[in-house]
Amino acid sequence: MKANELKEKSVEELNAELLRLLREQFDLRMKLNTDQLAQAHLVKQVRRDIARVKTVLNQKAGA
């Protein structure tokens, strides 16, 4: 997910995306801890996507 794509979305869409990513992160962590996750790099990728969404939300709140 690119930051430019996120900047075009509304605050409501960003909040929905953040909620979806947090749920996905939870699911990935559960699978990782129970040795059901073969693609461990997805945890890092989702964590960074969450950071991108939060950054754009903070930028929109300040503007």
From Swiss-Prot:
Recorded GO CC terms: cytosolic large ribosomal subunit
A GO term, aspect molecular function: structural constituent of ribosome
BP-aspect Gene Ontology terms: translation
Keyword Ribosomal protein tagged: yes
InterPro entries according to UniProt: Ribosomal_protein_uL29, Ribosomal_uL29, Ribosomal_uL29_sf
Alphabetized UniProt keyword annotations: Ribonucleoprotein, Ribosomal protein
Family named by the database record: Belongs to the universal ribosomal protein uL29 family.
Annotated NCBIfam families: L29
Protein name as annotated: Large ribosomal subunit protein uL29
